[in-house]
């Protein structure tokens, strides 16, 4: 923005012009010393090509797309055809997926912690994790623990169940229902016949190791009264179609059972063998038998049975990927730990496939992201780069190396890491926004230091995303004294402009691709999933936009000025904008000076020429252009102020 002050030959008539390009917010100095091109304040406005205009709003992404409870995750899974499925989670321990018309359960009964999930798609699965519940994978159909192979989930799609049983929609751990079996004193046997025989040996994918008898079979079972369960004749069985060759385990070997839910975990080697050669690779029938003691009645509901490696990647705070390998960071064994799965086999993890990054340096891993041929690992007070050589090596002996990037900047939040223009990585520290270009970490937020520096709480909640259509990176954060992300700071990397925004509570930001379009999705504290850069309101609430020009004075700030009028150009539109002004005779008065309305301009009126009468006398003047009705508008510079310098100094 060019600030030109023209003084007439008489030495009294004064014309001040604000010309493009405008450069966005500069909150580092007082309004009287804002550098050329910057603004002391701008809210809910964009500056494409340096021309100010009201920002585009947000709309509900899909009818009914509101997640219940306090949400802790918004993630996207992509099918092989690139079709997205959206996942969400909340603090009541529920994980959902969006069917296109409703949120539907994937898992229930997980931790009720406020810990946020981290997510990353690796190959054909979306991997999600938090440090309480562990690591899970979604394949487009179901959500299973990492390392698990599906056996049966008791959902309605499994239609080949035989025997007396019913769908239990009350006692459920996975999906929409469990499989309930009732015994009234005699054994009740219920069988499931998979469409294709189950191979409970072959590992998942082309490179994962095979399952052995040292691995485990797990399932959930809800028992209403364990004292009435005959554990000797209640069993699970996996075998051939004729029930002549099978592996069987009675409830006496399921571990300690209690009333309510029990998560049974048993070694394959613990199953008794019937017949000469039952084979784990061709399981054609899965049977559940429930028996009550004497003439008693007992109810048992089974849910979510799977085979899983005995050793799986531990629960961690952050997941990313590298060379098609799942990377998990900051785990339950150490906050500096990095774990890595076998290439192209995210389920397959070895206890030796782990190493620390800058261990015992006093800070923990906050986040990380793949970057070309490296993974950038951000700790509280430092950043590091790790590389790997996998060719010519055998897992878990991949060769990893690490090198420090900087100890001047750390990180505040994994979810603040955003890939921007030129494949640069941007993220928040506790008091800065920095950029990594593959060589060094540089601070980029100098112009808005006072805006960022007061942050003291909820640093972990800072979230970032990219609005490609506007050449912008977005970060939502919690200002001092608030408990939700009520502020947004946007960076227009084409104009190198910082653009604040208020009016939304964006607890998460997420980039997605749908039908070839890049989307920036967000979720509010009320669980509403919004598409940013869409519509003219913030989710039906009018957008209040404002633009504050720098303070101006005559050539001699000690001389009094009579401010006659301002001329504000604008594009034809609907609605109105209001031009306000405030005055001061000394810089110390600026902080408490209040705005007065000069005039409201009708944007569609052909007679409206944008001339605004001021008629005030002071040494300093500041103009503000504001719109509170949400009507879209564009300012067409220059903005001009006409004044006359008074002969008297007071």
Regions found by a protein language model. Give the residues of each.
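Hydrophobic or amphipathic alpha-helical targeting/insertion segments
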Residues: 116-147
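Extracellular carbohydrate-recognition regions
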Residues: 147-164
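Short carbohydrate-recognition loop motifs
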Residues: 168-194
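Extracellular beta-strand elements of beta-rich domains used
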Residues: 266, 286, 303-307, 638-639
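Beta-sheet repeat architectures centered on beta-propellers
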Residues: 1-125, 408-416, 420-424, 430-650
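Short beta-strand-plus-loop segments that form exposed binding edges in beta-rich domains
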Residues: 287-295, 624-630
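Beta-propeller and closely related beta-pinwheel folds
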Residues: 59, 63-70, 109-110, 311-462, ...
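Extracellular ligand-binding interfaces
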Residues: 192-276, 295-300, 573-592
């Amino acid at each position: 923005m060019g600030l030109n002050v023209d003084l007439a030959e008489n030495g009294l008539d004064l014309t001040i012009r604000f010309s493009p390009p405008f450069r966005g917010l500069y909150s580092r100095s007082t309004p009287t010393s804002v550098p050329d091109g910057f603004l002391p304040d701008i809210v809910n406005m964009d500056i494409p090509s340096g021309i100010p205009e009201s920002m585009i709003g947000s709309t509900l992404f899909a009818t009914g797309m509101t997640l219940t409870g306090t949400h802790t995750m918004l993630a996207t899974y992509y099918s092989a055809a690139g079709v997205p499925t959206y996942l969400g989670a909340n603090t009541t321990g529920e994980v959902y997926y969006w069917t296109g018309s409703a949120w539907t359960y994937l898992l229930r009964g997980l931790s009720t912690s406020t810990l946020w999930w981290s997510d990353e798609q690796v190959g054909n699965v979306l991997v999600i994790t938090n440090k309480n519940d562990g690591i899970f994978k979604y394949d487009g159909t179901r959500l299973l623990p990492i390392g698990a192979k599906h056996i049966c989930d008791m959902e309605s799609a499994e239609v080949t169940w035989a025997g007396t049983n019913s769908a239990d929609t009350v006692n459920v751990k996975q999906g929409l229902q469990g499989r309930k079996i009732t015994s009234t004193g005699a054994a009740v046997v219920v069988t499931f016949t998979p469409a294709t025989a189950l191979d409970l040996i072959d590992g998942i994918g082309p490179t994962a190791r095979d399952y052995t008898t040292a691995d485990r079979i797990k399932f959930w079972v809800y028992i209403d009264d364990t004292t009435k369960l005959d554990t000797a004749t209640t069993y699970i069985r996996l075998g051939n179609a004729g029930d002549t060759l099978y592996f069987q385990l009675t409830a006496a070997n399921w571990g300690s059972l209690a009333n309510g839910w029990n998560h049974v975990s048993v070694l394959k080697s613990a199953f008794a063998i019937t017949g000469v050669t039952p084979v784990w690779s061709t399981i054609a029938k899965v049977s559940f038998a429930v028996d009550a003691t004497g003439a008693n009645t007992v109810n048992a509901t089974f849910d979510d049975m799977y085979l899983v490696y005995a050793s799986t990647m531990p629960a961690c705070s952050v997941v990313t990927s590298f060379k098609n390998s799942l990377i998990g960071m900051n785990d339950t064994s150490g906050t500096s730990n990095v774990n890595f799965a076998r290439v192209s086999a995210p389920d397959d993890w070895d206890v030796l496939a782990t190493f620390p990054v800058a261990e015992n340096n006093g800070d923990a891993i906050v986040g990380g992201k793949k970057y070309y041929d490296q993974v950038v690992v951000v700790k509280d007070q430092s950043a590091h780069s790790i590389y790997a050589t996998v060719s010519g090596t055998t897992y878990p002996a991949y060769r990893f190396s690490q090198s420090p990037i900087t100890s001047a900047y750390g990180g505040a939040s994994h979810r603040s890491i955003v890939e921007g223009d030129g494949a640069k990585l941007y993220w928040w520290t506790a008091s800065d926004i920095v950029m990594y270009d593959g060589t060094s970490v540089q601070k980029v937020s100098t112009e808005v230091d006072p805006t960022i520096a007061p942050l003291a709480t909820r640093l972990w909640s800072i979230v970032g995303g990219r609005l490609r259509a506007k050449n912008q990176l977005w970060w939502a954060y919690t200002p001092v004294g608030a408990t939700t992300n009520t502020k947004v700071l946007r960076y227009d990397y084409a104009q190198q402009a910082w653009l604040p925004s208020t009016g939304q509570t964006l607890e998460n930001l997420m980039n997605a691709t749908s039908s070839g379009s890049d989307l920036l999705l967000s979720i509010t504290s009320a669980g509403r999933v919004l598409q940013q850069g869409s519509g003219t309101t913030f989710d039906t609430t009018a957008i209040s936009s404002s633009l504050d020009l720098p303070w101006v004075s005559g050539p001699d700030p000690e001389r009094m000025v009579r401010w006659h009028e301002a001329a504000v150009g604008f594009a034809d539109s609907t609605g109105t904008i209001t031009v306000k002004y405030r005055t001061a005779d000394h810089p110390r008065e600026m902080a408490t000076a209040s705005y007065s309305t000069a005039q409201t301009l009708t944007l569609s009126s052909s007679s409206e020429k944008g001339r605004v009468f001021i008629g005030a006398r002071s040494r300093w003047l500041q103009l503000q252009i504001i719109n509170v009705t949400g009507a879209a508008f564009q300012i067409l510079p220059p903005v001009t102020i006409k004044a006359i310098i008074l002969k008297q100094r007071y």
